[in-house]
Amino acid sequence: MQNDDDHKLGKALRPQQNQLPATLATSKKLVQHLKTALAQTGRDLAEDDGWVERLIRGLEAGINENTEIKAVIENKNGEQELNYLPQDKETWLALNRLDFSGEWLYKFSNLKILSAEIGKLHNLQELYLRNNQLTTLPAAIGQLQNLQKLNLRNNQLTTLPAEIGQLHNLQELNLWDNQLTTLPAEIGQLQNLQELLLINNQFTTLPAAIGQLQNLRRINLCDNRLTTLPAEIGQLQNLQELDLVGNQLTTLPAEIGQLQNLRRINLWDNRLTTLPTAIYQLQNLQDLGLGDNQLTTLPAEISQLQNLQELNLRNNQLTTLPAEIGQLQNLGKINLWDNRLTSLPTTISQLQKLRELHLSSNQFTTLPAEIWQLQNLIALNLGSSRLTTLPAEIGQLQNLQELDLSHNQLTTLPAEMGQLHNLYELCLLNNPLRSLPESLKRLYRERNGALKIKLDNPALLDD
């Protein structure tokens, strides 16, 4: 087991081509520098638990494998600190990737201090500092002019230095799981930034400078405290994905409609009572997430989103759908789970590309015949819908693979259920069924285990 641990540690610490010289001698030399550095901080780990010796053995275990160096230095207070580089700096200065992520070195997972020394690594292209306890970044971070990826996920950052704006080659910035309330205006200087992850912070608004990120393709602001978005967000002409789940938005700025390259917008779990009209201008939108809001109507203008492929309206307060929904000819999935629908428009039958239709937890007692014309359906969810009967036309859905009829009032099923030869999952839980049609039982036997039927009384399959 110890040998396995040594090998794993070696994989985390041995040099990578173009990052550190791939020879055992230089690797041992690096270890010696680490020992020297530890001694200079007043803490020598060489004897107390064999960590340095395990490090050397790990390097020997796979010296020829390509991976990156991962290392930290512990200061005399027991805190994890990168405070200076070893005396032989050439090996460090050549690094283009450095990973100090807490999950890799379990012994060193609480890095609290990142000193200005980091700014000397001018060739660095990727820096990973996730899962530590950093509260600030040094201004010297701005000296990493070649940095392309910076990952600071799961730290304790409350602010970013203005010098972050000097990272002109930065393409990906991950600030997920911190305590940020604002971004410096200098963030707008990151002209090559393509991905910005700000999930689970404490933002209530964004700076206007966000609109200067002309190459931004994805921004994720899930689980913050946003009540508004700046109008400047409409300037992000290359934006393709906008994630706003779990905020406090009641509307969107009209400028959202200028995002003509937007493919996906997710507004789950906000406070929308009406659909912002700017949404209808997003002609290239493919995925619209509106679940967990307070929508009571869906306007006819939804039909303008001709490229829409997925529409999620789960857990709102809809009582009807507009007939114009039938004009969404590219729609492949619609989720209407947990609304107040009693019927569907007849135009639903026009959605011939529809593959998934989720209608659970509504107030249906019967279903419109038009559903049975959706020949490409592979998933139909009708759970908790107050159904007392199921029409024979169910047998027309020859491509159906998943059918959920749980939590209804069904006492019988039509014989045509046996025609669903592609079905592999049928949920009938919580229905007062007294028997199953012979055709369904025969289908179950013929599928030889490929069809899973969930029943309160499995004995019904044996009758």
Residue ranges and their predicted role:
Residues P414:
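Glycine/serine-rich loop-strand microenvironments at binding/catalytic pocket rims
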Residues Q2-K120, E126-Y128, G142, Q148-N151, ...:
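The feature captures the LRR N-terminal capping module
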